Amino acid sequence: MSTTGRARDTDPLAGSWVTMADNEHSAVSNGSRSGRDAVGAWLSDHLVDLVQWRRHIHANPELSRTEFATTEFVSAWLTKAGLIPQVLPGGTGLICDIGPEGPRIGLRADMDALPLQEFTGLSFASTVPGVAHACGHDAHTTILLGTALALAELPQLPVGVRLIFQPAEEVMPGGAIDVVASGAMAGVERMFALHCDPRLEVGRVGIRVGAITSAADTIELVLDSPGGHTSRPHLTSDLVYAIGTVITGLPGLLSRRIDPRTSTVMVWGAVSAGKAPNAIPQTGMLTGTIRTGDHETWSLLEPMVREIVDGLLAPTGVRYQLNYRRGVPPVVNEVQSTRMFEDAIRALGPDALADTMQSGGGEDFSWYLEEVPGAMARLGVWSGEGEQLDLHQPTFDLDERALEVGVRVLTDIVLRAR
């Protein structure tokens, strides 16, 4: 496949990336081994399809809760394979069961794109102005679709599987919470997901026990005062002074009241107030985010923020309205689920398993893990050459060899399950 960080059209399938390598860490049963051989054969026959699917989805991105065409595309391929997909309430996203009845493993992919303009220059770049797949969800969807079709061709599976093609990951509090509310988790005992990581080279997959993402909440503080002349601040409530007090005071006091080992950080993203140098403004606004890697701390943040803000602003006389929007909890990888991921990753080769750190970003996969144990891993998508572009950049692209890696890992988790 592509040997650069861009998914070029010239010979995208130069060869399979993965050499399957059993070792002392990845012993498998004969049934699992034959299943893996069958998956390998399916991949050899369908690598072109994986690339074409990803490029089709990439060229036709859809924003959160509008993923109708993507849902129809996935549903059509699942139906063609003899499976029975069920579209989720709202008409975007779907679930599909494979394998025997009874307790199931859940595999999830998010489907939505971002509201930004793509500047990759690719022949299959977004055809929708202002909308782009810059977070790898086109790859996530393709990998889960490939996993579904590969597993569907096996005569039997050791465990039932529920595929969840999820809408609206990019908007808080995320589409996962609606998927859970719809009852789609009924019978699912464990959940797994992959997320593209441009910091890891293709062929490597990172995972860790414990928190791998952070909780992410949003604060909007609207302030109001009578306003006045800057020569007479004593006759009014100095709104700009009050804003400055909150800008420095809230992050500072949070850092003194919360254990630093929780990786809690409060950062302002936007501040606005006034226009004239000699007029104390009547209104102002601050917005920012609070992130933490600790689930217990997340539950304490909102009341603590409200208490601190009130204490900071009360002496100023400025009126305020605090809008605190809870986002998502951290994704906390459960031990056994992480070990299952690690075994599947090691089967790729001796250097495939990578260490990874906790991210400050939020991920709504965490809502599934509020219901059942599970784990998320980071799929390397960097070619190893050129610039490492970050997620959510308008020039972001990925090495398409990662599609095969993702299918191998997810199918292997299923085949090893008992």
Model regions and ranges:
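Extreme N-terminal basic, low-complexity initiation segments
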Residues: 2-10
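Acidic/His- and Gly-rich active-site-bordering loop/insert found
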Residues: 11-13, 17-133, 138, 142-145, ...
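Metal-dependent amide/peptide-bond hydrolase catalytic core
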Residues: 17, 21-23, 31, 244-418
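General structural feature for long, well-ordered alpha-helical segments within catalytic domains
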Residues: 35, 46-49, 53, 66-77, ...
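Divalent metal-coordination and catalytic microenvironments
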Residues: 57, 107, 137, 163, ...
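Histidine/acidic-residue-rich, glycine-tolerant segments that coordinate divalent metal ions
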Residues: 94-95, 114-116, 122-132, 138-139, ...
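Non-cysteine beta-strand/loop elements that form the S-adenosyl-L-methionine
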Residues: 106-108, 219, 376-382
